[in-house]
Amino acid sequence: MSELFTTHNFDVVCHFAAQAGVRYSVEAPEVYVHTNVLGTQTLLEVMQQNNVTRMVFASTSSAYGTTTQVPFKETSAADQPVSVYAATKRSAELLAYTYYKQYGIQTTCLRFFTVYGPWSRPDMAMLKFAQAITAGQPIDIYNHGDLRRDFTYIDDIVEGFVQAVHTPLGYEIINIGNGHPVKLLEFVELLEAQLGRPADRNLLPMQQGDVYETYADTTKAKELLGFTAKTDLADGMQVFVDWYQQYYQSQQTI
């Protein structure tokens, strides 16, 4: 990494690198600490050594942990994470603040809310559910479906990130979300309708490390970045389903 920074000039670092996902962090916490905490500190240290003074960091709504204030505001407490993943991403935010105070590295931490869309990670609910429903296999629904998620389409996430890249702000934490949480069972019903198949629902208790609700207050994103999510869940899911049927199902016929 040092060689990269000494041979190239960077105006802004876009920091997406991470070990992602709540559930795997229960099984392999050391991987999350090494990647998300030590990796971020290493990056910040190389930045300050090479006079790179701006970063936009992909953080997560999981940082809010057990907060009961909804919608989630950036001023809400974020000191009770319920997963190692959340703790490591929050730690990275705090490291960025320290480097801002010590070295003047400006960082905008964007807390993403339940990102979905084409080319999603294999462990994300929409893709896992689509694959299982198509194959006639059961889907695991935690807390018996009594969960709410602020699903945010990938194109909206990208738009918010690009706006942050072009907007120096010192040090800020900003929610990037849709602002309209949906019950998990409603999400499943919509996916069933768009796939044209019913799901075999396996209703389970709350999963370790999970939270009941995510719900973004997007006021700050509007004020500082001029950002508002444009894609509702039905429209975004339809784009996902079209992609899934074209890409995944076509692979099965080869």
Where are these regions (language model features)?
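Small-residue (primarily alanine) positions within well-ordered alpha-helices
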Residues: A17-A18, A58, A92, G160, ...
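Conserved C-terminal active-site "lid" loop/helix of NAD(P)H-dependent oxidoreductases
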Residues: I154, Q207-T228, D232, V239
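Glycine/proline-rich active-site loop of Rossmann-fold NAD(P)-dependent oxidoreductases
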Residues: R90, I105-T108, V115-K128, A135-P138, ...
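N-terminal Rossmann-like NAD(P)+-binding domain of SDR-like oxidoreductases, especially those catalyzing
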Residues: M1-V115, D155, T231, W243-S250
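Non-catalytic, hydrophobic alpha-helical segments
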Residues: I157, F161, I176, F187, ...
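Hydrophobic "lid"/C-terminal helical patch
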Residues: I133, F161-V165, V188-L191, M237-Y244
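Hydrophobic alpha-helix immediately C-terminal to the catalytic Tyr-X-X-X-Lys motif of short-chain
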Residues: S91, L95-Y99, F129, F187, ...
